[in-house]
Amino acid sequence: MSEKDSYMVFSGTSTRSLAEKICQSLGCELGQLVITKFSDGEFAVSYEESIRGRDIFLVQSTFPNSDNLMELLLMIDAAKRASARTINAVIPYFGWARQDRKDKPRVSIGAKLVADLLSVAGIDRLITMDLHADQIQGFFDVPVDHLYASGVILPYLQSLKLDDLVIASPDVGGSKRANTYAKYLGCPLVLCNKTRARANVVSSMQIIGDVKDKNVVIIDDMVDTAGTITKAADIMKEAGAKTVRACASHCVMSGPASERVQNSSLEEIVFTDSIPYSNRCAKVKQISVADMFAETIRRVINNESISSQYLV
């Protein structure tokens, strides 16, 4: 069996465009999979070609969370029952990752539950990108290949050739990620210290560092309602920043996010295509991570190291 015959790539409904680009990069066809939806809201998964003895790669971001997660679980179960040799879940955006610990009494740890569900369903490996918390890798008993969007975002930032560049973190929790970018680009780091009134609502924010006459790039792992990142951009502009941009791995962009970004001080906000973005906001740009995932899949198939893919 040749290398191309040894593996197959399939996609759920949430990330089909990215899966097609991954297959184009790999030089293979996207596998035939039918998802039948019923009037009561249930759905069934069926592989339309033999996958017996093959290494299967299932591409599916779990956003919006519940239906796409259930769809992925059924894809895994069907592959296991169809005698696939290995089942590799390729989850560019891992939903529920913000529920990685008990931050108050009597709450669930959603990320651990999702990890357990995927494991019980039958995955042999997880390939994902920029988990909200790195320690989620430890929730799995199977190998986890954790990729970083810096592999495509850093080259983009370098192409802008911005002088007086400053990297910013929108909160203290993201300082490690932002500091990695700052070190690679050889520029200063500034932080924002925020206080939340409740979930998705920022009550106050202060800048720690100098942004006057600087070109600021805010780095984050995801943008949800865009309240934090747009508030940070507006405050930095008021503090004298020349320009403010933002880069984030995952384009959740729910609720009022698009309107907030459009009306903010941001020059642009750059995401990967881990989540498709359909709203039209002139300030939103997406960079594909298809080649990065394709190369990872190729290396997994050939039992090669993937560490050389990481810029930082």
Where do the model's predicted regions map?
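PRPP-associated nucleotide enzymes
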Residues: 1-312
